[in-house]
């Protein structure tokens, strides 16, 4: 049989198995010969040969027979050159506006981008293998302000970025919104790309991981999905808490995680809580995440906030060189806005733009005028002590009973309500909340939180109690 005949067979197979199955399983096959009623083919991996034998072997034999090339069985031999003749997509030499996950073809050469805002260092080139998410050119180590709350996370991130050799596997960064987790993730990718231009770095959010997996299932193309994720040098997944409770996605993530660890590949993951605090996260995943280095990025302190503002002011000052600041403005903002870095930087950006429009010097009074809503929103901080106090007053019980081992419903239900409010209105972890409630285990706190959530759906009085207490605490 000639190669022309095999090409005709391939076209018939395409019509039968569909484009996705054809691309994943038939296209990588190279015809060799038919010898003693055995059709010989070359394949790039044993896995492909085994899969095609089990799923398409009989179909291939029927199509061969239909084209006058009779054979009784198929035999696959692994060859590194198999599939090399398959044409790459025409657009692989140009940067893609929306990178695709299924990027098995050679990646484009680095493309240099200029940061939209002035920065002390030039924006790095986009890494060659980032099919999941585009990196922010401003999220580099040079633009990351280090202070006591984040110095350990910064040091760990720098260590991982120094080499392709596995350092901490995985490195797990966690903390509240706007504290710098994503910034450090991007910075690691930029630094690794700078040191190792040929490295395959896959950075994406957990939500993107889930959507790509669901699409692969829908299109019956899980092979390419697995190949994409398991052929990388570094896998970086942001906001892993998103897949908690999503059984199939968690199972695939678990297998991907294990495969990369076994191959000695570096994994970096971020989340909004410690693995032990993630409700509905598969215990196997939580256990794996805790096997590496788990680093908490703490809420900002005054010194760090002031440093962030000073750095941001330098960048914005290049864009608005005519704007002047009165003494004490940055210190005032650092003192008043303590929620997170994102809010802090957004407030300063707004202040610069406002001062530019009204052509006035930036003073504390101007800041109060411009940032009324931001300052009001950050004025009130709910603490666990306040929650215990207000909940005890509302239900008319003693605080000593609240943290006791008393299991009577008249005490247990208010206790669970207070646990629920602590979880919803503060950034405290489950173990921290448990410590506040007489040293209870984090699983007890989680049970209490879920119990109130369940009761709120069925009991309007419980829902009303929770809402009234929330309003009282946030007033």
Swiss-Prot record:
Binding, ATP: 178, 180-182
UniProt GO molecular function: ATP binding; ATP hydrolysis activity; DNA replication origin binding; lipid binding
One GO BP annotation of this record: DNA replication initiation
Protein location: Cytoplasm
Classification via InterPro entries: AAA+_ATPase (IPR003593), Chromosome_initiator_DnaA (IPR001957), Chromosome_initiator_DnaA-like (IPR020591), Chromosome_initiator_DnaA_CS (IPR018312), DnaA_C (IPR013159), DnaA_dom (IPR013317), DnaA_N_dom (IPR024633), DnaA_N_sf (IPR038454)
A family per Pfam: DnaA_N
UniProt-annotated stretches for the region Domain I, interacts with DnaA modulators: 1-71
The entry's keywords: ATP-binding, Cytoplasm, DNA replication, DNA-binding, Lipid-binding, Nucleotide-binding
Region ranges (Disordered): 107-129
CDD domains linked to this entry: AAA (cd00009), Bac_DnaA_C (cd06571)
Keyword Nucleotide-binding: yes
Free-text comment about domains: Domain I is involved in oligomerization and binding regulators, domain II is flexibile and of varying length in different bacteria, domain III forms the AAA+ region, while domain IV binds dsDNA.
Name by which UniProt lists this protein: Chromosomal replication initiator protein DnaA
Originating organism: Jannaschia sp. (strain CCS1)
Lineage start: Bacteria, Pseudomonadati, Pseudomonadota, Alphaproteobacteria, Rhodobacterales
Gene encoding the protein: dnaA
């Amino acid at each position: 049989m000639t190669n022309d005949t095999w090409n005709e067979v391939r076209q018939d197979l395409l019509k039968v198995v569909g484009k996705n199955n054809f691309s994943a399983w038939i296209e990588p096959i190279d015809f060799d010969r038919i010898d003693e009623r055995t059709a010989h083919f070359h394949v790039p991996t044993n896995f492909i040969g085994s899969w095609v034998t089990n799923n398409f072997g009989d179909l291939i034999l029927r199509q061969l027979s239909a084209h006058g090339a009779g054979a009784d069985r198929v035999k696959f031999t692994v060859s590194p050159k198999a599939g090399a003749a398959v044409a790459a997509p025409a657009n692989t030499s140009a940067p893609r506006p929306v990178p695709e996950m299924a990027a098995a073809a050679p990646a484009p050469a680095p493309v240099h981008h200029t940061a939209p805002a002035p920065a002390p260092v030039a924006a790095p080139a986009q890494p060659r293998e980032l099919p999941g998410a585009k990196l922010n050119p401003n999220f580099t180590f040079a633009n990351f302000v280090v202070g006591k709350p984040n110095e350990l996370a910064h040091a760990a991130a720098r260590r991982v970025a120094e080499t392709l050799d596995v350092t901490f596997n995985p490195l797990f960064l966690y903390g509240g919104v706007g504290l710098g987790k994503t910034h450090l993730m991007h910075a690691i990718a930029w630094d690794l790309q700078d040191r190792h231009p040929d490295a395959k770095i896959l950075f994406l959010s957990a939500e993107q991981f889930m959507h790509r997996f669901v699409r692969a299932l829908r299109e019956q193309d899980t092979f390419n999905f697995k190949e994409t994720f398991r052929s990388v040098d570094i896998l970086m997944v942001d906001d892993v808490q998103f897949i908690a409770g999503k059984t199939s996605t968690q199972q695939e993530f678990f297998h991907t995680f294990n495969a990369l660890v076994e191959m000695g590949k570096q994994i970096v993951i971020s989340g909004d809580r410690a693995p032990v605090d993630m409700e509905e996260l598969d215990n196997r995943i939580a256990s794996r995440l805790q096997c590496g280095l788990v680093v908490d990025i703490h809420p900002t302190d005054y010194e760090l906030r002031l440093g962030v503002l000073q750095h941001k002011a330098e960048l914005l000052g290049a864009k608005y060189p005519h704007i002047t600041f009165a003494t004490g403005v940055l210190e005032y903002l650092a003192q008043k806005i303590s929620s997170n870095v994102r809010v802090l930087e957004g407030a300063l950006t707004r202040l610069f733009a406002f001062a530019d429009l009204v052509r006035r010097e930036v003073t504390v009074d101007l800041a109060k005028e411009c940032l009324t809503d931001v300052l009001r929103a950050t004025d009130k901080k709910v603490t666990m002590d306040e929650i215990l106090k207000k909940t005890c007053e509302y239900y008319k019980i003693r605080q000593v009973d609240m943290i006791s081992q008393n299991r009577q419903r008249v005490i247990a239900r208010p206790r669970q309500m207070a646990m629920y409010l602590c979880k919803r209105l503060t950034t405290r972890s489950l173990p921290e909340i448990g410590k506040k409630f007489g040293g209870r285990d984090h699983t007890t706190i989680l049970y209490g939180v879920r119990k109130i959530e369940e009761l709120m759906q069925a009991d309007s009085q419980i829902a009303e109690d929770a809402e009234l207490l929330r309003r009282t605490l946030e007033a």
